[in-house]
Structures are given as C-alpha cells and as structure tokens.
From Swiss-Prot:
<feature type="repeat" description="TPR 1">
    <location>
        <begin position="35"/>
        <end position="68"/>
    </location>
</feature>
<keyword id="KW-0677">Repeat</keyword>
<dbReference type="GO" id="GO:0031676">
    <property type="term" value="C:plasma membrane-derived thylakoid membrane"/>
</dbReference>
<comment type="similarity">
    <text>Belongs to the Ycf3 family.</text>
</comment>
<keyword id="KW-0802">TPR repeat</keyword>
<comment type="function">
    <text>Essential for the assembly of the photosystem I (PSI) complex. May act as a chaperone-like factor to guide the assembly of the PSI subunits.</text>
</comment>
<dbReference type="InterPro" id="IPR019734">
    <property type="entry name" value="TPR_rpt"/>
</dbReference>
<keyword id="KW-0793">Thylakoid</keyword>
<dbReference type="InterPro" id="IPR022818">
    <property type="entry name" value="PSI_Ycf3_assembly"/>
</dbReference>
<dbReference type="Pfam" id="PF13424">
    <property type="entry name" value="TPR_12"/>
</dbReference>
<protein>
    <recommendedName>
        <fullName>Photosystem I assembly protein Ycf3</fullName>
    </recommendedName>
</protein>
<dbReference type="GO" id="GO:0015979">
    <property type="term" value="P:photosynthesis"/>
</dbReference>
<keyword id="KW-0602">Photosynthesis</keyword>
<feature type="repeat" description="TPR 2">
    <location>
        <begin position="72"/>
        <end position="105"/>
    </location>
</feature>
<feature type="repeat" description="TPR 3">
    <location>
        <begin position="120"/>
        <end position="153"/>
    </location>
</feature>
<keyword id="KW-0472">Membrane</keyword>
<dbReference type="InterPro" id="IPR011990">
    <property type="entry name" value="TPR-like_helical_dom_sf"/>
</dbReference>
Amino acid sequence: MPRTQNKDNFIDKTFTVMADLIVKMMPINDKAKRAYVYYRDGLSAQNAGDYAEALENYEESLKLEESPFDRSETLKNMAIIYMSNGDEDLALDTYQRALDQNSNQPSCLKNMGLIYEKRGRTAQEAGLQDEADRLFDRAADVWTQAVRLYPGGYLDIENWLKTTGRSNIDVYF
C-alpha cells in the first residue's frame, strides 16, 4: 500500500485526498504528476522515519522529474537522509548534485558546512591541526555562500565565521 494511503488519522487522510485531487487537476503532464506523487510519498516516509522507503520513492521521482528546481529539492532530501545515516561522503556528493540543479539552496550549503566543521573538530581532536584548518576553511567557504544567500538566517554560523576569524564578508547589519 502506498504510504499516502496508509494514514491513521482524519487530518492526514483528508490532506492526502485533497493533495491527490489537486495533483489530478494540475495543468502538468502525467510524468510530472507521477514524479510529484513519488516525491510526496518519499517525504511522507522520511517524516515517518522510514528512510529506505523514502529513498526508493525519491529515486523513482528523480527518474521522472525534469524540473531542475524539483530535482534539487528531491536531492536535498536524499542528502539529509544520508547525513542522518552517517554517510557523510554520499551526503556531500548529493548536496552538490542538488546545488548543481539549483544553486539557490542555502540549506544545502549550511549542511555541507556542518559536515566539514565536524570533520575539522575530529581532526583537531586527533592532533591533525593542518587537516583541521583545511576542513574549517572549507566549512567557512560554504557557510559564507549560505550566509550570502540567506543573510540573517544563520546567526550561529555568522557568529562562528566571526569568532574564528574566517568571515570575509560583511553581512552583519
């Protein structure tokens, strides 16, 4: 049974029925509608914590979806799952693929920076200061891009950039 038909409460069932009706009435081709249904089912599975099912639905959506914007959203959600599962290399690659489809994704850049910053702290704790500095600089690079796209939206990141001396932009109003 598709996840969208497996709802336990009235509100979820009502929302699903309404979403299905809207999709049917949308003036888009059948392929795009099917891509959206897979995306929606993937999002539902992801929200329920069923990451394997979510990834399957997202992969099917990507096979059908032609819109770069929609593909980027799907890829971003896949990267979030990879990151949650601890597969940081695959998450970084998938975030980059999302950015290649739509460069206006500050949350992808923010999450990439989180991975680089975490790796930098790990290297620092292991006494590998040169490696740590390289990773912190990489985090600063992607975080600077994120802050430029979403000024004021990542105050903790802006603060990190300032306190570590890695801020090379004036985004603080």
